[in-house]
Design a protein with these regions (language model features):
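Residues lining hydrophobic/aromatic ligand-binding pockets adjacent to catalytic sites
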Residues: 1-280
């Protein structure tokens, strides 16, 4: 069985104050606090803009030696048929500090639902591997057309890891499958807010969801299958609104019997107790 690491998709959310972070914690102290509770994080801000390398230098220095980062590829690399070589060069240059520090878990390439299964897009996936060389790359395919042995064989051939997901069960969305096509094992929990998935005014509404223990228990055997086939397995919660991702990450780690900080990580608005009712 592989090493299983649980974390969240992003960490710098202001609405986590008073739930996960202390109310008055400064923005610049959030990563250090987060890294005292979790051993991995998924960086999503890189999807929208490419940071200067010094940003990751600071992140690497702020976190413990065992902490690592999954970094989402910039959208220009996944959402445009023609990739600008300059954008790719800037993105890989930004990653160098994490690579040199031994803290880059993988690159997450998230494709849109409109990325359909066809010959052209199969070629784009092959080009993705060629561009990233030997770097570990996880691919999140959001259209259910891709589910099947043909795709899994393609990803294995390209040494691209398949991103398993948990999300609402709508036609055309990815089903809940457990598969490893290349290292690492990888699962993203987006929440099951079916009401707001397609119809929402703000993007965060889609991810306003708190998993129940019963819902997470469905993934225990799946995580077992994934971890049996990969040396490392990453489980990231993307239901970030109001700290629900962090709450579920601790909850699921506890259910899996993984070492975590205590449930006291979660504080009430009064600064006492926890959302898990430790003082009840």
């Amino acid at each position: 069985m592989s090493k299983i690491l649980v974390g969240t998709s992003g960490f710098g959310y202001d609405d986590w104050r008073g739930v996960f972070y202390p109310e008055k914690l400064k923005k610049g102290e959030m990563l250090r606090y987060y890294a005292s509770r979790f051993s991995t994080v998924e960086i999503n801000t890189t999807f929208y803009g490419i940071p200067a390398p010094k940003t990751f230098v600071k992140m690497a220095e702020t976190t413990p030696p065992w902490f690592d980062f999954a970094v989402k590829a910039n959208k220009e690399l996944t959402h445009n048929p023609e990739v600008d070589p300059g954008v790719f060069a800037s993105f890989t240059e930004a990653l160098k500090p994490l690579l040199e520090a031994g803290k880059l878990a993988c690159v997450l390439a998230q494709y849109p639902w409109s990325f359909r299964k066809n010959e052209e897009n199969v070629g784009r996936l092959r080009q993705l591997r060629e561009r990233f060389g030997d770097l570990p790359v996880v691919v999140e395919l959001r259209n259910a057309e891709w589910v099947g042995e043909e795709t899994f064989d393609l990803l294995k051939d390209c040494r691209l890891a398949f991103c398993c997901v948990d999300e609402p069960r709508f036609k055309g969305l990815m089903p809940r499958v457990a598969i490893v096509t290349a290292p690492p094992g990888y699962v993203r929990f987006h929440g099951r807010n079916a009401k707001k998935w397609w119809q929402h005014e703000e993007s965060w509404e889609r991810y306003d969801y708190l998993y129940t223990p019963e819902e997470l228990s469905e993934w225990i055997p799946r995580v077992g299958e994934i971890s049996a086939a990969a040396e490392k397995t990453y489980l990231f919660f993307n239901n970030h609104y109001k700290g629900q991702a962090a709450q579920n990450a601790v909850m699921f780690a506890d259910m899996l019997g993984l070492p975590t900080e205590s449930k006291e990580t979660f504080i009430s608005e009064q600064g006492q107790g926890s959302l898990f009712g430790m003082n009840d």
